[in-house]
Amino acid sequence: MTNKAIYPGTFDPLTNGHLDLVTRAAKMFDVVVLAIAASPSKRPLFDLNERVALATQVTAHLPNVKVTGFSDLMADFARQQQANILIRGVRAMTDVDYEMPLAKMNRHLMPALETVFMLPAEAWSYISSTLVKEVALHGGDVDHFLPAPIAKEVRARLHP
């Protein structure tokens, strides 16, 4: 049986913390689908196609990672992808508190889908896309927190 994992998120923008998790997941699972949620209610900085293109660019070195956009219910998307693992990154207990009901609902909707919580590397344990965007918006240097091509696009978008 192939262990196919889905790592879903808005990834607006995809940070070095996200890249660390997907890189580590690629070593653990046969296939990892980096599933980028449309999330229009979050009013993303980059549209879905832009986020998919940027994520594809920075994960090109990972042959078993496939990047795709989605707007479905997670359990339905996992079924379509024939995935049996759902990866969720957790930085703190507040993330666990948020993720537990989602994991339980996904288990109810698709019992074969197992949720795996992964901790970020220490260097990335405090960053989030929202925090990085806020720093960038105010002219702060975000190069340390984002893959280079994404940092360049964030700067161009926020400070044309």
From Swiss-Prot:
InterPro entries: Cyt_trans-like, PPAT, Rossmann-like_a/b/a_fold. Signal peptide: none annotated. ATP binds at T10, F11, H18, G89, V90, R91, E99, W124, S125, Y126, I127, S128, S129, T130. Keywords: ATP-binding, Coenzyme A biosynthesis, Cytoplasm, Magnesium, Nucleotide-binding, Nucleotidyltransferase, Transferase. Its cofactor is Mg(2+). GO terms for molecular function: ATP binding; pantetheine-phosphate adenylyltransferase activity. It comes from the Bacteria. Pfam families: CTP_transf_like. GO terms for biological process: coenzyme A biosynthetic process. It is an enzyme of class 2 (transferase). GO terms for cellular component: cytoplasm. It is found in: Cytoplasm. Its main location: cytoplasm. Pathway: Cofactor biosynthesis; coenzyme A biosynthesis; CoA from (R)-pantothenate: step 4/5. Homohexamer. Reversibly transfers an adenylyl group from ATP to 4'-phosphopantetheine, yielding dephospho-CoA (dPCoA) and pyrophosphate. This is Phosphopantetheine adenylyltransferase. It comes from Sodalis glossinidius (strain morsitans). The gene is coaD.
